[in-house]
Protein backbone atom coordinates (compact mmCIF):
# COMPACT_ATOMS: atom_id res chain seq x y z
CA UNK A 1 0.00 0.00 0.00
CA UNK A 2 1.57 3.27 -1.12
CA UNK A 3 1.49 6.71 0.39
CA UNK A 4 -1.31 9.22 -0.14
CA UNK A 5 -0.20 11.92 -2.58
CA UNK A 6 -0.27 15.49 -1.31
CA UNK A 7 -1.59 17.13 -4.48
CA UNK A 8 -0.18 20.64 -4.72
CA UNK A 9 -1.84 21.38 -8.06
CA UNK A 10 -5.36 20.66 -6.82
CA UNK A 11 -4.68 22.63 -3.65
CA UNK A 12 -3.34 25.54 -5.72
CA UNK A 13 -6.55 25.58 -7.75
CA UNK A 14 -8.57 25.81 -4.54
CA UNK A 15 -6.49 28.82 -3.48
CA UNK A 16 -7.00 30.47 -6.87
CA UNK A 17 -10.74 29.92 -6.47
CA UNK A 18 -10.58 31.79 -3.16
CA UNK A 19 -8.48 34.61 -4.60
CA UNK A 20 -10.64 35.40 -7.64
CA UNK A 21 -13.59 37.01 -5.80
CA UNK A 22 -11.22 38.86 -3.48
CA UNK A 23 -9.35 40.32 -6.45
CA UNK A 24 -12.67 41.22 -8.11
CA UNK A 25 -13.76 43.08 -4.96
CA UNK A 26 -10.47 44.99 -4.85
CA UNK A 27 -10.80 45.82 -8.54
CA UNK A 28 -14.33 47.14 -8.00
CA UNK A 29 -12.97 49.37 -5.24
CA UNK A 30 -10.27 50.74 -7.54
CA UNK A 31 -7.47 48.86 -5.77
CA UNK A 32 -6.51 46.21 -8.34
CA UNK A 33 -3.52 44.24 -7.02
CA UNK A 34 -0.37 44.27 -9.14
CA UNK A 35 2.52 41.78 -8.97
CA UNK A 36 5.91 42.88 -10.24
CA UNK A 37 8.94 40.77 -11.11
CA UNK A 38 12.54 41.74 -11.74
CA UNK A 39 14.38 39.12 -13.80
CA UNK A 40 18.09 39.58 -14.52
CA UNK A 41 19.69 37.43 -17.20
CA UNK A 42 18.45 34.51 -19.27
CA UNK A 43 18.55 31.53 -16.91
CA UNK A 44 15.98 29.10 -18.39
CA UNK A 45 14.66 28.00 -15.00
CA UNK A 46 14.18 31.56 -13.79
CA UNK A 47 12.53 32.57 -17.06
CA UNK A 48 10.08 29.67 -16.85
CA UNK A 49 9.29 30.45 -13.22
CA UNK A 50 8.61 34.11 -13.97
CA UNK A 51 6.42 33.19 -16.95
CA UNK A 52 4.45 30.91 -14.67
CA UNK A 53 3.93 33.65 -12.10
CA UNK A 54 2.50 36.02 -14.68
CA UNK A 55 0.28 33.28 -16.12
CA UNK A 56 -1.05 32.74 -12.60
CA UNK A 57 -1.79 36.46 -12.33
CA UNK A 58 -3.95 36.29 -15.44
CA UNK A 59 -5.96 33.41 -13.96
CA UNK A 60 -7.05 35.40 -10.90
CA UNK A 61 -7.13 38.95 -12.31
CA UNK A 62 -3.93 40.39 -10.80
CA UNK A 63 -2.08 42.97 -12.91
CA UNK A 64 1.35 41.84 -14.18
CA UNK A 65 4.32 44.20 -14.08
CA UNK A 66 7.46 42.66 -15.56
CA UNK A 67 10.98 44.08 -15.67
CA UNK A 68 13.47 41.90 -17.60
CA UNK A 69 17.09 43.05 -17.54
CA UNK A 70 20.26 41.77 -19.28
CA UNK A 71 22.72 39.67 -17.29
CA UNK A 72 25.50 42.26 -17.48
CA UNK A 73 23.63 45.16 -15.87
CA UNK A 74 25.33 47.24 -13.21
CA UNK A 75 24.29 47.40 -9.57
CA UNK A 76 23.15 50.97 -10.22
CA UNK A 77 20.75 49.84 -12.94
CA UNK A 78 19.32 47.10 -10.75
CA UNK A 79 18.87 49.59 -7.91
CA UNK A 80 17.08 52.00 -10.23
CA UNK A 81 14.65 49.25 -11.24
CA UNK A 82 13.99 48.31 -7.62
CA UNK A 83 13.43 51.96 -6.73
CA UNK A 84 11.04 52.33 -9.67
CA UNK A 85 8.84 49.46 -8.46
CA UNK A 86 9.03 50.74 -4.88
CA UNK A 87 7.52 54.00 -6.12
CA UNK A 88 5.07 52.52 -8.67
CA UNK A 89 1.51 52.81 -7.28
CA UNK A 90 0.29 50.05 -9.64
CA UNK A 91 2.74 47.58 -8.07
CA UNK A 92 1.27 46.19 -4.85
CA UNK A 93 4.15 43.78 -4.31
CA UNK A 94 7.06 42.35 -6.26
CA UNK A 95 9.96 39.96 -6.22
CA UNK A 96 13.57 40.02 -7.35
CA UNK A 97 13.97 36.64 -9.04
CA UNK A 98 16.91 34.68 -7.63
CA UNK A 99 19.61 33.72 -8.33
CA UNK A 100 21.12 36.96 -9.58
CA UNK A 101 24.33 36.98 -11.67
CA UNK A 102 27.39 36.59 -9.45
CA UNK A 103 28.53 40.22 -9.81
CA UNK A 104 25.33 41.44 -8.11
CA UNK A 105 24.77 41.32 -4.34
CA UNK A 106 21.56 39.37 -3.70
CA UNK A 107 21.27 40.41 -0.06
CA UNK A 108 21.69 44.08 -0.91
CA UNK A 109 19.04 43.79 -3.62
CA UNK A 110 16.54 42.13 -1.29
CA UNK A 111 17.17 44.72 1.42
CA UNK A 112 16.47 47.53 -1.07
CA UNK A 113 12.93 46.22 -1.69
CA UNK A 114 10.30 48.19 0.24
CA UNK A 115 9.23 45.79 3.04
CA UNK A 116 5.63 46.87 2.41
CA UNK A 117 5.96 45.51 -1.15
CA UNK A 118 7.84 42.32 -0.28
CA UNK A 119 5.75 39.68 -2.06
CA UNK A 120 8.18 36.86 -1.18
CA UNK A 121 8.23 37.56 2.56
CA UNK A 122 12.03 37.40 2.53
CA UNK A 123 12.98 40.99 3.36
CA UNK A 124 15.03 41.08 6.60
CA UNK A 125 12.39 43.31 8.20
CA UNK A 126 9.61 40.84 7.44
CA UNK A 127 11.66 37.84 8.56
CA UNK A 128 12.20 39.74 11.81
CA UNK A 129 8.46 40.27 12.11
CA UNK A 130 7.99 36.53 11.66
CA UNK A 131 10.32 35.97 14.62
CA UNK A 132 8.32 38.48 16.68
CA UNK A 133 4.97 37.06 15.57
CA UNK A 134 3.72 40.37 14.16
CA UNK A 135 1.79 40.67 10.85
CA UNK A 136 3.93 40.59 7.70
CA UNK A 137 4.05 38.81 4.34
CA UNK A 138 5.06 35.20 5.00
CA UNK A 139 7.71 33.31 3.00
CA UNK A 140 5.80 31.56 0.23
CA UNK A 141 7.26 28.05 0.25
CA UNK A 142 7.07 27.52 4.04
CA UNK A 143 3.53 28.90 4.01
CA UNK A 144 2.65 26.49 1.21
CA UNK A 145 4.08 23.54 3.15
CA UNK A 146 2.02 24.32 6.25
CA UNK A 147 -1.11 24.81 4.15
CA UNK A 148 -0.58 21.49 2.33
CA UNK A 149 -0.22 19.61 5.62
CA UNK A 150 -3.42 21.18 6.95
CA UNK A 151 -5.28 20.53 3.69
CA UNK A 152 -4.71 16.80 4.15
CA UNK A 153 -5.48 16.85 7.89
CA UNK A 154 -1.94 15.93 8.88
CA UNK A 155 -1.57 16.80 12.55
CA UNK A 156 1.00 19.52 13.17
CA UNK A 157 0.38 20.40 16.82
CA UNK A 158 2.78 18.40 18.96
CA UNK A 159 4.34 16.70 15.93
CA UNK A 160 8.08 16.21 15.62
CA UNK A 161 9.09 17.79 12.31
CA UNK A 162 12.57 17.23 10.90
CA UNK A 163 13.53 19.88 8.34
CA UNK A 164 16.56 19.03 6.19
CA UNK A 165 18.11 22.26 4.92
CA UNK A 166 18.76 25.63 6.53
CA UNK A 167 18.33 27.96 3.57
CA UNK A 168 16.71 31.36 4.01
CA UNK A 169 13.86 30.60 1.59
CA UNK A 170 12.66 27.34 3.16
CA UNK A 171 14.47 25.72 6.08
CA UNK A 172 15.01 28.61 8.45
CA UNK A 173 11.63 30.35 8.04
CA UNK A 174 9.76 27.02 8.01
CA UNK A 175 11.05 26.32 11.51
CA UNK A 176 9.72 29.71 12.61
CA UNK A 177 6.27 29.03 11.13
CA UNK A 178 5.98 25.56 12.59
CA UNK A 179 6.90 26.69 16.11
CA UNK A 180 4.28 29.44 16.26
CA UNK A 181 1.52 28.77 18.79
CA UNK A 182 -0.93 28.28 15.93
CA UNK A 183 1.14 25.31 14.68
CA UNK A 184 2.89 24.22 17.90
CA UNK A 185 5.23 21.65 16.36
CA UNK A 186 8.62 20.61 17.67
CA UNK A 187 11.22 21.21 14.96
CA UNK A 188 14.67 19.73 14.42
CA UNK A 189 16.61 21.68 11.78
CA UNK A 190 19.24 19.53 10.06
CA UNK A 191 22.10 20.56 7.77
CA UNK A 192 25.57 19.51 6.59
CA UNK A 193 26.89 19.52 10.15
CA UNK A 194 24.18 17.19 11.47
CA UNK A 195 25.44 13.91 12.89
CA UNK A 196 23.52 10.72 12.08
CA UNK A 197 20.76 12.28 9.99
CA UNK A 198 18.89 8.96 9.54
CA UNK A 199 18.54 8.55 13.31
CA UNK A 200 16.75 11.90 13.45
CA UNK A 201 14.53 11.44 10.41
CA UNK A 202 13.38 8.02 11.64
CA UNK A 203 11.97 9.73 14.76
CA UNK A 204 9.98 12.29 12.79
CA UNK A 205 6.23 12.46 12.25
CA UNK A 206 6.89 14.85 9.36
CA UNK A 207 10.06 15.16 7.26
CA UNK A 208 10.70 18.14 4.98
CA UNK A 209 13.59 17.67 2.53
CA UNK A 210 14.79 21.01 1.15
CA UNK A 211 18.44 20.72 0.19
CA UNK A 212 18.58 20.03 -3.55
CA UNK A 213 20.42 16.69 -3.28
CA UNK A 214 18.89 14.11 -5.59
CA UNK A 215 17.11 11.28 -3.74
CA UNK A 216 18.82 12.11 -0.44
CA UNK A 217 15.94 10.79 1.67
CA UNK A 218 15.52 7.04 1.28
CA UNK A 219 12.98 4.61 2.71
CA UNK A 220 15.31 3.36 5.45
CA UNK A 221 15.43 6.94 6.81
CA UNK A 222 11.66 7.29 7.25
CA UNK A 223 9.32 6.01 9.94
CA UNK A 224 6.36 4.02 8.54
CA UNK A 225 3.34 6.28 8.15
CA UNK A 226 5.28 9.55 8.33
CA UNK A 227 4.40 12.53 6.13
CA UNK A 228 7.18 13.51 3.72
CA UNK A 229 7.43 16.86 1.93
CA UNK A 230 9.80 16.94 -1.05
CA UNK A 231 10.99 20.50 -1.75
CA UNK A 232 14.51 20.33 -3.20
CA UNK A 233 15.12 19.96 -6.93
CA UNK A 234 18.22 18.65 -8.73
CA UNK A 235 18.99 18.47 -12.43
CA UNK A 236 20.29 15.00 -13.39
CA UNK A 237 20.83 13.01 -16.59
CA UNK A 238 17.30 11.69 -16.07
CA UNK A 239 15.84 15.19 -15.77
CA UNK A 240 14.65 17.09 -12.70
CA UNK A 241 14.33 15.00 -9.54
CA UNK A 242 13.51 15.77 -5.94
CA UNK A 243 15.26 15.13 -2.64
CA UNK A 244 13.03 12.12 -1.88
CA UNK A 245 13.81 8.68 -3.32
CA UNK A 246 10.85 6.94 -5.00
CA UNK A 247 11.06 4.01 -2.55
CA UNK A 248 9.82 6.33 0.23
CA UNK A 249 6.33 6.17 -1.29
CA UNK A 250 6.01 2.52 -0.25
CA UNK A 251 6.61 3.27 3.42
CA UNK A 252 5.38 6.79 4.19
CA UNK A 253 1.78 7.70 4.92
CA UNK A 254 1.75 10.89 2.84
CA UNK A 255 4.23 12.22 0.26
CA UNK A 256 4.25 15.38 -1.83
CA UNK A 257 5.31 14.72 -5.44
CA UNK A 258 8.11 16.71 -7.01
CA UNK A 259 7.19 18.37 -9.30
CA UNK A 260 3.54 19.01 -8.53
CA UNK A 261 3.67 19.24 -4.76
CA UNK A 262 5.07 22.30 -3.04
CA UNK A 263 6.02 24.26 -6.20
CA UNK A 264 2.46 25.18 -7.24
CA UNK A 265 1.74 26.37 -3.71
CA UNK A 266 4.84 28.58 -3.63
CA UNK A 267 3.40 30.46 -6.60
CA UNK A 268 -0.12 30.45 -5.16
CA UNK A 269 1.01 32.07 -1.92
CA UNK A 270 3.03 34.65 -3.82
CA UNK A 271 -0.30 35.82 -5.25
CA UNK A 272 -1.96 35.47 -1.86
CA UNK A 273 0.66 37.75 -0.31
CA UNK A 274 -0.01 40.37 -2.99
CA UNK A 275 -3.78 40.19 -2.48
CA UNK A 276 -3.36 40.48 1.30
CA UNK A 277 -1.07 43.49 0.86
CA UNK A 278 -3.76 45.14 -1.30
CA UNK A 279 -6.48 44.33 1.23
CA UNK A 280 -4.50 45.91 4.06
CA UNK A 281 -4.10 49.22 2.23
Swiss-Prot record:
One of its GO terms (molecular function) is methenyltetrahydrofolate cyclohydrolase activity. GO terms for cellular component: cytosol. Pathway: One-carbon metabolism; tetrahydrofolate interconversion. It catalyses: (6R)-5,10-methylene-5,6,7,8-tetrahydrofolate + NADP(+) = (6R)-5,10-methenyltetrahydrofolate + NADPH; (6R)-5,10-methenyltetrahydrofolate + H2O = (6R)-10-formyltetrahydrofolate + H(+). One of its GO terms (biological process) is purine nucleotide biosynthetic process. The keyword Amino-acid biosynthesis applies. Keywords: Amino-acid biosynthesis, Histidine biosynthesis, Hydrolase, Methionine biosynthesis, Multifunctional enzyme, NADP, One-carbon metabolism, Oxidoreductase, Purine biosynthesis. Pfam families: THF_DHG_CYH (PF00763), THF_DHG_CYH_C (PF02882). NADP(+) binds at residues 165-167, 192, 233. Catalyzes the oxidation of 5,10-methylenetetrahydrofolate to 5,10-methenyltetrahydrofolate and then the hydrolysis of 5,10-methenyltetrahydrofolate to 10-formyltetrahydrofolate. This is Bifunctional protein FolD. It comes from Mycobacterium bovis (strain ATCC BAA-935 / AF2122/97). The lineage of its organism: Bacteria, Bacillati, Actinomycetota, Actinomycetes, Mycobacteriales. The gene is folD.
